[in-house]
Amino acid sequence: MLHYRESKPNQQKTIVFLHAAGFDGRIWKQAAEQLDDFHCVCPDLPGHGQSKAIQVTDFDAASDAVAELIGSLGGDPVCLAGLSMGSYIGFRLLARHPHLVEGAVFSGFQHKPIEVSGVMRALMHASSFMMNSRKNREKMARSLGVNDPSLVSQRGGRPNASSKTMRKISSLALDFDVSNDLQAIETRTLVLAGETEHPAILSSLPAFQSGMPQCTARIVPGLGHGWIATEPDLYAETLRAWFLQNPLPEGLNAVTAD
């Protein structure tokens, strides 16, 4: 089963946090501290951290691993929060195990494949090896607003995920296609993106909002893929509002129809 960290296990509602590629469950430490009125569960996803031995094959299998963890917690359906890779996995969890989740907040993913050239795929493939360098990993983390260098490495300086795992996840993300699955997702879901996100992610917001029966989409003005790290207070406020079914923060912009 996936390794996980948890806090405040006696709280009534549980949030399961799903991290981005190249990180592990430690990335959610600040969010868990700010959301101390929730039971927060922060797993290391397949191929990452202390779950590195669980191979990444596809996002469906990864979602099944998260479902196994949620089932082991017992109790009521959980709230789900995902960033980037965690959002892809989280969406597949809603599709495959909807009974386990009462509400979800996802950021930084798209609903259909991103068209890239063979040359670009080759460059992305090559860049995965650069993440073997601790210096490069820390530079990448800082570009996302993550200032704690320890979060990109395990003890001894090893990366949280192998270059092979990073290549696999990159390929799965580029090819992700749930355009025909949106209508079937009935879980109450909030989909977010920074205003300077990749165009494919921004253009997916109206599709999520119109295609999923209980979906709301919002844009975080002036920020990009790593907005959760640069605006942790806004993120925590957003999660609390959505999961308690209160009005969303005014700092989020509405998404117009496609």
What are these regions (language model features)?
Residues 1-16, 36-39, 74-76, 160, ...:
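Alpha/beta-hydrolase fold catalytic core
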Residues 6-52:
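Conserved HGGG/HGGXW glycine-rich cap/lid loop of the alpha/beta-hydrolase fold
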Residues 29-30, 39-81, 237:
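Active-site loop/oxyanion-hole signature of alpha/beta-hydrolase fold enzymes
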Residues 82-86, 90:
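Gly/Ala-rich beta-loop-alpha elbow adjacent to hydrolase catalytic centers
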